[in-house]
């Protein structure tokens, strides 16, 4: 399989990361969770008391971050941050940092460089519209806010994080609003992307649907 790139976009909690991860394994191509990159920047910014409006400090921070992936886990400067970036404080702040134009420019450049070297499946908010505009396969994965909140709540409970359904739903809706209304690369479906609503489908059914479309070509 040569020069293949698969773009998977969608709102928070739609299941796109899980779906992209399985597709990467099935097709034996590199999976890049671009959301993890924004989460890692958010984590490092909070640790260093850097506010979203402090552009120069944010740029310096990102340029000091050596980002790589070990399987599905994000590694920054040699440290595995996968568990740290899934904490509620990151969920509540990531959209603010991801909305900063300079942050997006630097991370998009990193993501595009990776796609030039490897066959990739990437998931995020602006993969099909910005990062991999010329990807031959584009999918927009969505589900109702309530379904997404239930999924996210289950994930958090499995990690021992105690939070109410209403709080998770509120967070999902707030992130949807910020992601869809930001000035730079807002969340939207690419015109040539295939829309898949996962509300009434299992992860396995969605993966099979996408893999069948790719293998058909």
Swiss-Prot record:
Compartments it resides in: Cytoplasm
User: What gene, per UniProt, encodes this protein?
Assistant: cmk
Q: What keywords does the record list, in alphabetical order?
A: ATP-binding, Cytoplasm, Kinase, Nucleotide-binding, Transferase
* GO cellular component terms listed in the entry, alphabetical order: cytosol
Q: What is this protein called?
A: Cytidylate kinase
CDD domains according to UniProt: CMPK (cd02020)
Q: What is its EC number?
A: 2.7.4.25
Any Gene Ontology biological process: pyrimidine nucleotide metabolic process
| Species assigned in the record | Clostridium botulinum (strain Langeland / NCTC 10281 / Type F)
Family membership: Belongs to the cytidylate kinase family. Type 1 subfamily.
Gene Ontology MF terms: ATP binding; CMP kinase activity; dCMP kinase activity
Query: Where along the chain is ATP bound?
Result: 10-18
Coiled-coil zones: none
Catalytic function, reaction form: CMP + ATP = CDP + ADP; dCMP + ATP = dCDP + ADP
């Amino acid at each position: 399989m040569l020069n293949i790139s698969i773009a998977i976009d969608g709102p928070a909690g739609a299941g796109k990361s899980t779906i992209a991860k399985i597709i990467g394994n099935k097709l034996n191509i590199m999976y890049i969770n671009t959301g993890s990159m924004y989460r890692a920047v958010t984590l490092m910014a909070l640790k260093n008391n850097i506010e979203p409006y402090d552009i120069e400090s944010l740029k310096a921070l990102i340029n000091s971050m050596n980002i790589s992936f070990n399987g599905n886990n994000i590694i920054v400067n040699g440290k595995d941050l996968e568990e740290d970036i899934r904490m509620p404080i990151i969920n509540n702040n990531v959209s603010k940092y991801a909305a900063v134009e300079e942050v997006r420019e630097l991370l998009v450049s990193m993501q595009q460089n990776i796609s030039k070297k490897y066959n990739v499946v990437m998931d995020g908010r602006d993969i099909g519209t910005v990062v991999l505009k010329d990807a031959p396969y584009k999918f927009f994965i969505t589900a109702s806010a309530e379904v997404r909140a239930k999924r996210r709540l289950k994930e958090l409970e499995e990690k021992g994080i105690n939070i109410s359904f209403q709080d998770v739903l509120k967070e999902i809706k707030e992130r949807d609003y910020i992601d869809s209304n930001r000035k730079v690369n807002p969340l939207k479906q690419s015109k040539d992307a295939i829309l898949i609503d996962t509300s009434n489908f299992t992860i396995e059914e969605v993966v099979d649907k996408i893999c069948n479309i790719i293998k058909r070509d």
